[in-house]
Amino acid sequence: MNRNQNLREFLPQDGFAGTLIGRAWIPTAVSGKTAGPSPVWLTESGVLELSSIAPTCAELLDNGFSTKGVDASKLANVGSYDAIMANTLASKRDANLPYFLSPVDLQAIKACGVTFVVSMIERVIEERAAGDAKKADEIRDKIKTRIGADISSIQPGSLQAEELKNALKAEGLWSQYLEVGIGPYAEVFTKAPVLSSVGPGAEVGILAISSWNNPEPETVLLVDSRAKVVGATLGNDVNLRDIEGRSALLLGKAKDNNASCAIGPFI
């Protein structure tokens, strides 16, 4: 950890004013029980263990957790936010102290692709460049000149989108990425297996064979089993542009790798 790093920068601008749910590893030395992960509630006075209410974040959110009616004095305080975050970010964590984990545990982890005009065009560029970063600038200029202005005002799935699709096909510029960008169906894929996401302080995984990649900041929505959005956090989708650019069928190889899904710090 950078000694000058402000630990409070990992909190929302309003600090602890809202309801902040996280997940932490609680060692036996602190809990007096078998060491393990637990949902936690972050407050100004301390980080409160919620395992007595629900054993996982998935169950906690699915049950519609609310701080109203919860007697905080009956919950175990496992330490201050600052102390736990400092241990989370430490180059060598103290195993006898708690540290934060990804707040996502048993939920399925899905991702949506080609959600913005810019990202859609970039996917087309990757496909045309076949994973070659040197060709990307030339192709980017060509595509933006030809279709950039038209795409931005198109309503996906509309008659106008269908007309544009036909025009692009005629010009040899049609792409599977434009299909999901302006077509009626969104791209939704499984990003990572259950319990595989990493949280604050962890290093993300980059496939060793990739030489053209970048972080991909995302808004992460927490959705219960009734399809209701119950919370939000941040994520890094970790994009291997040279791998996916070779073929969309390599999406799994580009996206689903060890520690390639970073989520957090808190819901």
What are these regions (language model features)?
Residues 29-36, 228:
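Short, solvent-exposed loop/turn segments that connect beta-strands within catalytic domains
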Residues 35-78:
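N-terminal cap/recognition module
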Residues 2-26, 42, 69-267:
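Active-site microenvironments in enzyme catalytic cores
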